[in-house]
Amino acid sequence: MAEAANSDIQTYKTFNDFFTRPLKVGVRPIANAAFICPVDGAISQFGSIQQDQIFQAKRHNYSILALVANNTNLASKFENGHFACLYLSPKDYHRIHMPCDGNLKTMTYVPGALFSVNPNTAANVPNLFARNERVLCEFESVQHGTFVMVLVGATIVGSMATVWHEAIDGVKNGIINPPRSKNIRTWTYLEKNIFLKQGDEMGRFLLGSTVVMLFEKDTLQFNVDWQPTRGIKLGEEMANAL
């Protein structure tokens, strides 16, 4: 609570308000890097995409196409590209920020299961992140091309929200789910001119979950200090541009 903008636990009106509490200004300085870590949490996996296959855990890969709900045009942009999968536990700060500057292009809600996404489950459930409920946020960067941030739902994650879903779409608190749907839903923002700067908040989870990021081929080189299971903080160096 020492890092929270409001450290008085008695003043939070709801459970959701408490678990999505913002941080004090300045407690997560932004590194001088092309790409910063967008969350507090731990590294699940990261690295190069092998053709269209993303490494989940030993003996388990999943395809870009499955992750992006069979959007072939979007999937093709990331073949032989780069990915990072970051896990947020229930104790972590639950807001997600921008790794670099980006213009929002589309947001897609994909219905799915709600498996736990903790490290043990990731090691044992095939195609975990492509099976769970998720929200795909597609951005365009002048410097770095197209990139995607996938907010993956999980057991007891009651909702996912984005900052623009309230400000632009008029949805209370920006919550995308509930309502849950059996159908894929897409919102297009090409004419809305929604620009988010590196470090800006873009969304949040109730409790913990996972963010998967996809970047185009030959756009970045990951921080040499990064390793799977390593703890991470919002704002630290994630990668530099190639």
Task: Go through each PLM region and give its residues.
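Contiguous, well-folded functional domains in the mature portion of proteins
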Residues: M1-L242
